[in-house]
Amino acid sequence: MRTFALLTAMLLLVALHAQAEARQARADEAAAQQQPGTDDQGMAHSFTWPENAALPLSESAKGLRCICTRGFCRLL
């Protein structure tokens, strides 16, 4: 009886895993169709803190600029 329960549980896990892979493949395909032409090119974002920012900044942080690209940010 224990063997039957284990085999049933394993079969259920395999079936759920196959379903999850199919759903992930469909989600990846849909995402690729929604964004044509976007390869793995990094996107760059730039943030600049104005002198009159809402949060008080120390003298060393005034005019601080952050450049963020895919994977890391660096401060200028």
Curated annotation (Swiss-Prot):
There is a cross-link at residue 73 (Cyclopeptide (Cys-Arg) (interchain with R-65 in subunit B)). Residues 23-64, 74-76 form a propeptide. Residues 25-45 are annotated as: Disordered. It comes from the Eukaryota. There is a cross-link at residue 65 (Cyclopeptide (Arg-Cys) (interchain with C-73 in subunit A)). One of its GO terms (biological process) is innate immune response in mucosa. RTD-1 is expressed in bone marrow. Detected in promyelocytes, myelocytes and mature neutrophils and monocytes. Disulfide bonds join 68-73. Residues 1-22 form the signal peptide. One of its GO terms (cellular component) is extracellular space. RTD-1 is a cyclic heterodimer composed of subunits A and B; disulfide-linked. RTD-3 is a cyclic homodimer composed of two subunits A; disulfide-linked. RTD-1 and RTD-3 have similar antimicrobial activities against the Gram-positive bacteria S.aureus 502A and L.monocytogenes, the Gram-negative bacteria S.typhimurium and E.coli ML35, and the fungi C.albicans 16820 and C.neoformans 271A. This is Rhesus theta defensin-1/3 subunit A. The lineage of its organism: Eukaryota, Metazoa, Chordata, Craniata, Vertebrata.
